[in-house]
């Protein structure tokens, strides 16, 4: 039976990225990269949990607490206008797990890793979105390595599909 050439991303506050398989996949590689198996009806989802739009949601909350209220569309627009790849963060770094001032967290991560420190809302959001898209790329490459085959299609579902900029970066 031919194996599908696609994977999925369930995109929202958190992201799940993986493939559907007939049997669970258990290997040293899967363990090393922190993949898991979830049983479903007639299949198993072999996947990895990834930070999602939590980064942007928490930045938005921090700005709102400072009296600057942005819609997600406004934040995406500002990010689209910002210069690309001014800095990158690992979205799964423990710095970003707890609620709080995510703007300060992103800036602190950039300072700690000796990168450009984002200096505007647009740059902060662009750093978050580009970093998330590159994390998706990293997970895709690990999936292909573990499966031993190329995955040429990504199906994205969930509330995160409303963020067209993230979807474009992911493509």
Q: Predicted segments — roles?
A:
Residues 158:
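Small/polar loops that bind or transfer phosphate-bearing groups
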Residues 1-154, 162-171:
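Active-site core segments that coordinate phosphate-bearing ligands/cofactors
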